Amino acid sequence: MRTKIELGKLGENLAADFLERRGFRIVDTNWRCPSGEIDLVAFDGEFLVIAEVKARRSLRYGHPFEAITDAKLRRLRTLAVLWARHHGFFSSPIRIDAVAVLIPQGEEPRLEHLRGLG
């Protein structure tokens, strides 16, 4: 059984591969600043995409997307603007996405992508 940190890292790696196979260009991972952390930053066409990755071993405590609260979404919006300013992307439209990664013991991972949160 993986630790929570190992599960999160595996989930982020699987999510990055998943998005790349769908044409996204990953430009940053685990970007941190005093306001928080962004799991994945990517481009989907013209959109600068901030992707929140939620990995779980099971649905016992609910679907991974249920862990994205209104407060988390507000923080992601703030982080998106901070990342764009820090990296000089002033004209790209910004979109917040989420990737749910379910990694049951002994089974293949299952991923879901939700575009354009709130």
Curated annotation (Swiss-Prot):
GO terms for molecular function: nucleic acid binding. PANTHER family: UPF0102 PROTEIN YRAN. InterPro entries: Restrct_endonuc-II-like, tRNA_endonuc-like_dom_sf, UPF0102_YraN-like. SUPFAM superfamilies: Restriction endonuclease-like. The lineage of its organism: Bacteria, Bacillati, Actinomycetota, Actinomycetes, Micrococcales. It comes from the Bacteria. Belongs to the UPF0102 family. This is UPF0102 protein RSal33209_1090.
